[in-house]
Regions:
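Active-site mouth loops of central-metabolism enzymes
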Residues: 8-22, 107-110, 169
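Glycine-rich, proline-tolerant flexible connector loops at the mouths of alpha/beta enzymes
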Residues: 39-49, 132-143
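Alpha-helix-loop-beta-strand connector modules within alpha/beta enzyme cores
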Residues: 51-69, 89, 97-112, 144-168, ...
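Catalytic beta/alpha-barrel core
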Residues: 14-16, 37-49, 58-60, 64-94, ...
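Short, small-residue-biased leader/transition segments that mark boundaries at the very start
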Residues: 1-6
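Catalytic cores of alpha/beta
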Residues: 68, 73-83, 112-124, 168, ...
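Glycine-rich phosphate-binding active-site loops on the catalytic face of alpha/beta enzymes
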Residues: 89-96, 129-142, 178, 182-205
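Conserved, mostly hydrophobic/aromatic
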Residues: 38, 77, 120, 128, ...
Length: 217
């Protein structure tokens, strides 16, 4: 099922609206470049607009056999049967979302500390979006920056606690950062700006997926 595809993905692409690209364009390019895990993130947009965009993107992701999740909008995820939801620190708690959605939907939670990870794990999250790695322009109100040391520390505390969850690094990550971030033990990376700022976002997505394939051999 498309909803399981994300478990084998190193790259999660987060849609972003820029001067050059719409949310839909940005998702098209990431999918064309080989990404199979897309998150629609439209902070502060009216729900009706998010729904319109989500239906188009969901259709697109299904064509590519990609996992499609939506940031924050739990009710919408349930209504249109998206694959899952990503919940930020100020969004609905993971446990509450799990009650609403049941076990068949993916729920990801944002974490900045091991305590956050533990809380999400106990609440039934399927993966963790962990960051920020460094300062990022696509997000307002950032938590303290983790850097490589922060990831190493969280990954080792997870091992000690016997917590096995995919952990996706996020926040201002560039192409050059990827090998050293993956070496900390995280399972993936989430990108937005890095891909969209490239001269050719499709090629950039391919390049990112390829460095990962090389590193995993």
């Amino acid at each position: 099922a498309a909803s399981d595809v994300y478990k084998r993905q190193v790259l999660q692409f987060i849609t972003h609206f820029t001067d050059s690209y719409s949310y839909y364009d940005s998702a098209c390019m990431a999918l064309e470049g080989g990404c199979r895990w897309i998150q629609l993130r439209m902070k502060d947009a009216p729900v009706s607009e998010v729904e319109q965009e989500a239906l188009r993107l969901q259709h697109l992701c299904r064509d590519y056999g990609a996992t499609f999740i939506i940031d924050d909008h739990v009710e919408l995820v349930k209504k249109i049967h998206a694959d899952g939801v990503h919940l930020g620190k100020k969004d609905m708690p993971v446990a509450e979302a799990r009650k609403m959605l049941g076990k068949d939907f993916i729920i990801g939670g944002t974490a900045n500390t091991f305590e956050d990870v533990k809380m999400h794990y106990e609440a039934g999250a399927d993966y963790i979006g962990c960051g920020p790695f460094r300062f990022t322009t696509t997000k307002k109100n950032l938590s303290p920056i983790l850097g490589l040391e922060g990831y190493r520390s969280i990954v080792s505390q997870m091992k000690e606690a016997g917590i096995h969850l995919p952990i996706v690094a996020i926040g201002g990550i560039t192409f050059e950062d990827i090998p050293s971030i993956m070496a900390t033990g995280v399972t993936g990376i989430a990108l937005s700006g890095t891909i969209l700022r490239a001269d050719n976002p499709i090629e950039e997505t391919r390049r990112i997926i390829n460095i990962e394939k090389i590193n995993n051999k």
